[in-house]
């Protein structure tokens, strides 16, 4: 295994402040160099973090698109410029190349501690399997959504998102901070074990594969005209079947799920997703058998 440097990003969204605190605290207590691997810690969007807002011009976590990161676009938006800086500094061809990136986020939804993967890269599966095997964390596999692209971790050869909630934006929660510290510490230990052939991957990986997103009920003017149904609030990862309630509109009408397939909702009522016209996303459950190729690809980094 030739991994030499791993990038830990917090504050990709400026109002998600708990991982920033956790990283600062962790970095004071732990050596950035561990078992031959150097760990780089950086605030993804420092200007937004100082202002306490999600972003300045556009979502940084949708700004890692090749077509938008070309030279003529560098000065268009702050986040586009910032994405280019991060790639120039820490990208695989950057001045301090990192082979792996871990992006730390919080959510206002009741997601607990979870992993988010983008696509089916074997290296990512290997990394996620280490954490799911240790903590039993649910994995949200986001793929094939043309409306949502340009995620930070996709710009590196290997990476994943750690998502923890529920917690309000710009609110420090010691329990959330402790969870981040535990995950960062454990991930470092698990990578070291894998590097020294001291750990085996689980036989299978359970993932929740993104299928789409559902908007709030809206009136003829496009204004939100319904709330998430009381039975659905805080029920992330809980199965939904045909006929189960999703929303309660202003007329008292219950909007029910009318699909034939079982689904599992995620990011229910996430505040930041209102602007994206998303009340919740939904997934299907899939079990993926582990492959030796996962470790081989990871070791090739």
Swiss-Prot record:
Family, per the entry?
Answer: Belongs to the AspA/AstE family. Aspartoacylase subfamily.
Lineage: superkingdom: Bacteria
Q: Which InterPro entries match?
A: AspA/AstE_fam, Aspartoacylase, AstE_AspA_cat, Aste_AspA_hybrid_dom
Task: Kindly list the organism's lineage.
Answer: Bacteria, Bacillati, Cyanobacteriota, Cyanophyceae, Synechococcales
Q: Does the keyword Hydrolase apply?
A: yes
Q: Where does substrate bind?
A: 54, 61-62, 163, 273
Q: What is this protein called?
A: Probable aspartoacylase
Give the residues the record marks as binding Zn(2+). Answer: 13, 16, 105
Q: How is the cofactor bound?
A: Binds 1 zinc ion per subunit.
Q: Which keywords does this chain's UniProt record carry?
A: Hydrolase, Metal-binding, Zinc
Catalysed transformations (reactions): an N-acyl-L-aspartate + H2O = a carboxylate + L-aspartate
Q: Got a GO cellular component term for this one?
A: cytosol
Query: Mind telling me which residue stretches traverse the membrane in this protein?
Result: none
What is the scientific name of the source organism? Prochlorococcus marinus (strain AS9601)
User: What Gene Ontology terms describe what this protein does at the molecular function level?
Assistant: aspartoacylase activity; hydrolase activity, acting on ester bonds; zinc ion binding
Q: What is its EC number?
A: 3.5.1.15
Cofactor section: Zn(2+)
């Amino acid at each position: 295994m030739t991994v030499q440097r791993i990038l830990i990003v917090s504050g990709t969204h400026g109002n998600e402040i708990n991982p920033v605190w956790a990283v600062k605290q962790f970095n004071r207590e732990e050596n950035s160099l561990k078992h031959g691997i150097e760990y780089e810690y950086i605030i993804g969007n420092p200007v937004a973090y100082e202002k306490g807002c999600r972003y300045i011009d556009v979502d940084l976590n949708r700004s890692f698109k090749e077509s938008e990161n070309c030279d003529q676009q560098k000065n268009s938006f702050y986040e586009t410029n910032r994405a280019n800086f991060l790639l120039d500094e820490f990208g695989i061809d950057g001045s301090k190349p990192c082979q792996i990136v871990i992006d730390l986020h919080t959510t206002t939804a009741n997601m607990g501690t979870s992993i988010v993967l983008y696509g089916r890269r074997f290296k990512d599966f290997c990394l996620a399997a280490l954490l799911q095997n240790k903590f039993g964390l649910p994995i949200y596999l986001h793929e094939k959504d043309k409306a949502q692209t340009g995620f930070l971790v996709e710009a590196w050869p290997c990476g994943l998102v750690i998502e923890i909630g529920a917690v309000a934006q710009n609110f420090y929660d010691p329990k959330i901070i402790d969870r981040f510290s535990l995950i960062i510490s454990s991930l470092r230990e698990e990578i070291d074990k894998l590097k020294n052939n001291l750990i085996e991957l689980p036989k299978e990986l359970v993932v929740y594969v993104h299928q789409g997103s559902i908007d709030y009920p809206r009136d003829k003017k496009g204004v939100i005209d319904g709330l998430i149904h009381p039975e659905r609030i805080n029920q992330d990862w809980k199965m939904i079947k045909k006929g189960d309630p999703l929303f309660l509109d202003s007329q008292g009408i219950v909007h029910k799920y009318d699909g034939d397939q079982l689904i599992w909702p995620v990011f229910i009522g996430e505040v930041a997703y209102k602007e994206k016209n998303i009340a919740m996303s939904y997934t299907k459950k899939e079990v993926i058998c582990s492959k030796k190729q996962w470790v081989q690809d990871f070791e090739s980094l």
